[in-house]
Amino acid sequence: MRTSYLLLFTLCLLLSEMASGGNFLTGLGHRSDHYNCVSSGGQCLYSACPIFTKIQGTCYGGKAKCCK
């Protein structure tokens, strides 16, 4: 009996997540902006980019700059 309640609860959670835009479900498999920056040879900085580097994007959800 507990198993059926658990399955029903899980199904309701998934359906409510899909109805609200599916941020959790669509976010699976996406790389973070920090990962993309560092893997392309950049570094994430909250301050200005060092000399001889330029801004290539953002990190931490737009709170920092990706300098390369």
UniProtKB/Swiss-Prot annotation:
BP term (GO), one: defense response to Gram-positive bacterium
Record SUPFAM superfamilies: Defensin-like (SSF57392)
Keyword tags: Antibiotic, Antimicrobial, Defensin, Disulfide bond, Membrane, Secreted, Signal
Disulfide linkage: 37-66, 44-59, 49-67
Highest taxon of the lineage: Eukaryota
Compartments, record wording: Secreted; Membrane
GO molecular function: CCR6 chemokine receptor binding; identical protein binding
Signal peptide from the UniProt entry: 1-21
Family matches, as Gene3D superfamilies: Antimicrobial Peptide, Beta-defensin 2, Chain A (3.10.360.10)
Propeptide stretches in the record: 22-32
Family, per entry: Belongs to the beta-defensin family.
Function: Has bactericidal activity. May act as a ligand for C-C chemokine receptor CCR6. Positively regulates the sperm motility and bactericidal activity in a CCR6-dependent manner. Binds to CCR6 and triggers Ca2+ mobilization in the sperm which is important for its motility.
Protein name: Beta-defensin 1
Organism the protein comes from: Pan troglodytes (Chimpanzee)
